[in-house]
């Protein structure tokens, strides 16, 4: 049987949605018999935008906006084909960006 190490990186603007998605991935992996490390919390990234309210005058009057991006990492150290199939059939919400990185392919 071929075992692989899988890293699943999740990004979202909504932290509650991100935590729910991470929890469903972890429960699915544990039901399939995988050992799970995580979720590992990364620092949130805050991008701030400051815009003048009026076009040419009144420099003191400004509007502030920000976007907060939350990240989580889930690691599956020994994943086989049944675990991968279970994770591929999982339905996640549209607001969550998922990146999967597969490392290795040694026989175990």
Curated annotation (Swiss-Prot):
Lineage, opening ranks: Bacteria, Pseudomonadati, Pseudomonadota, Alphaproteobacteria, Rickettsiales
Record GO terms (molecular function): structural constituent of ribosome; tRNA binding
Protein's UniProt name: Small ribosomal subunit protein uS10
A biological-process GO annotation: translation
Family: Belongs to the universal ribosomal protein uS10 family.
PANTHER family associated with the record: 30S RIBOSOMAL PROTEIN S10 FAMILY MEMBER
InterPro entries: Ribosomal_uS10, Ribosomal_uS10_dom, Ribosomal_uS10_dom_sf
One GO CC term on file: ribonucleoprotein complex
Organism listed in the record: Ehrlichia chaffeensis (strain ATCC CRL-10679 / Arkansas)
